[in-house]
Amino acid sequence: MDNMVKTKKQGLLIVISGPSGCGKNSIINELLKIRNNIWVSISCTSREPRGEEKNGINYYFLSKEEFERDIKNDEFLEYAEYSGNYYGTPKKYIKEHLDNGEDVILEIEIQGALKIKEKLDETVFIFIMPPTMNELKRRLINRKTDSLEKIEKRFKRAYEEINEIPKYNYVVVNDDLDKAVKKVDAILEAERCRVDRIEEVYLDSKEERIHEALLDDVKDFDNSKIEIK
């Protein structure tokens, strides 16, 4: 008998957001080690690279003029301005990977996430939380990539972002990286089992087909030799 349930080939579109310093990238990097069907979309930004960030790996770094040109040409699935810089998700490649059955992760700011929610309601939205605000501030300071003024702006912005949690499907507190990764992995597994993501169920088929398939199973069972000791 064929499988009772056939899942869609289409991959999941997953949006992961959270305050700067909550550990989004660390969770995604660990997730890539345990799942081989994930593609992480590379965002575009008009900000300058930080530390050892590389173009085409961490971000596509564009000038403000280049970014605004791409906005006019409708090149982005979403875009937003954050701390004086543009961030956006290029449309290119995302559909291709989804159609190939790969799950696509977008690590984007909340403004952009909410724009995607308006357009694509099947998207899975996950919000990553720091264990405490004091811990978040400590992480931002220890990164040593921003001035104290920028850190204060990020910290204040974090409070605003946390107020948007009810608009997400899931929230994961990153107080332990391994546990946080397992929770996100479990979310993706559960999403694949949702009824509305199933392509075909026998209950949607003709009654005769169900009956014939069940008879085939019974016939195979009767013809099998089972020795009980």
Task: Walk through the language-model features, giving the residues of each.
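Short hydrophobic/aromatic beta-strand immediately N-terminal to the Walker A/P-loop
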Residues: 13-15
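Post-Walker A helix-loop "phosphate-sensing" segment adjacent to the P-loop in P-loop NTPases
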Residues: 32-41
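Conserved lysine of the Walker
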Residues: 24
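ATP-dependent small-molecule kinase phosphotransfer cores
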Residues: 43-104, 111
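P-loop (Walker A) phosphate-binding loop of NTP-binding proteins
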Residues: 17-19
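Post-Walker A alpha-helix
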Residues: 27-28
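NTP-dependent small-molecule kinase module
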Residues: 2-7, 160-229
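Conserved phosphate-donor/acceptor-positioning beta-strand/loop module used by diverse small-molecule
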Residues: 104-109, 118-143, 173-176
